[in-house]
Curated annotation (Swiss-Prot):
This is Protoheme IX farnesyltransferase, mitochondrial. Converts protoheme IX and farnesyl diphosphate to heme O. GO terms for cellular component: cytochrome complex; cytosol; mitochondrial inner membrane; mitochondrial matrix; mitochondrion; nucleolus. Keywords: Disease variant, Heme biosynthesis, Leigh syndrome, Lipid metabolism, Membrane, Mitochondrion, Primary mitochondrial disease, Transferase, Transit peptide, Transmembrane, Transmembrane helix. Its EC number is 2.5.1.141. It catalyses: heme b + (2E,6E)-farnesyl diphosphate + H2O = Fe(II)-heme o + diphosphate.
Amino acid sequence: MAASPHTLSSRLLTGCVGGSVWYLERRTIQDSPHKFLHLLRNVNKQWITFQHFSFLKRMYVTQLNRSHNQQVRPKPEPVASPFLEKTSSGQAKAEIYEMRPLSPPSLSLSRKPNEKELIELEPDSVIEDSIDVGKETKEEKRWKEMKLQVYDLPGILARLSKIKLTALVVSTTAAGFALAPGPFDWPCFLLTSVGTGLASCAANSINQFFEVPFDSNMNRTKNRPLVRGQISPLLAVSFATCCAVPGVAILTLGVNPLTGALGLFNIFLYTCCYTPLKRISIANTWVGAVVGAIPPVMGWTAATGSLDAGAFLLGGILYSWQFPHFNALSWGLREDYSRGGYCMMSVTHPGLCRRVALRHCLALLVLSAAAPVLDITTWTFPIMALPINAYISYLGFRFYVDADRRSSRRLFFCSLWHLPLLLLLMLTCKRPSGGGDAGPPPS
């Protein structure tokens, strides 16, 4: 069927229009900049979406031949420290720069140094010392068996028994024995001193045995023998038993039963009451003061065989002296006691700690004045003891007002020489025994 003239003319017109459109499209694409060409193409059958026009990110990504070319400047990586650079193996390298000292004639202050002189002043060498920090730390934390040498045992046992504190306990016991009325019996005095010393060693050893987990957290006690593992807990308990049994036996059989009972009661009070109470209540300070006040009473009972008013006066002096002594000491160790988990006045009640210290400093004045009233000393004693009692009271007042480390240290160091001097003055001013009203000490 032959096409009509109208159909032929329509096809011819359509072909001309299509050719014109193709020609214009071709010219437009050739005249467009090359950098916008990828926005008009269908690459890898992916049509243009609105994501390509997100100019807020300031990032232009060209996807050609299935590869991405990022035209944004990469973010700089953090610069490692030049002094310590950790490697993957846990080691560390420390660089130590050794600089040659500048010689005075090398540079003149009147002219500007040139580049060659500045180069000469640079470090001569850089020494790199590889320190195996990770390995050393691992070796330090590794468990090591500590072998006990025989010649080290006396020193370890001395630290276990707190030999300095034991010496102070024995000296106060000796002062109580010497201040008691009646003749001085040397065999009884020696037995009392030995028995009291053994009882003190036993109490201190048991105290350290119970407080190992807490002493390890304190700088003041972290080097104790049980904490460091220098001796076993079994050896510590065995040593305490070997001290407690003969000590109490000597006091009971060699001196008198009253003194032995006081020694046994003091061991119980220190180990079973004071030691656990340190982590429960601040009342441990008052209980500990009672423990420290019993030794001079034991010395008095060893000489007289009875509890008189003079024994309680000596116990009261030791009781009051311990508060300024210990409260001032604990004030500088508040962080240590907190780390160890102990409940101390200086940590939980700092105001009460200072008030109690001042209160008992003033109590020493009253107790010293009561000594001649009870016929223990002459009236010369309170007069001679007035300066040292007034001085410790002044330091107690400064500690109460200032509440700082300096005032606490001054009060603590004053208490160290105050007690020996006060007891020495009491012995010097002791009232002579009249008429033999006190018989010889019982065997």
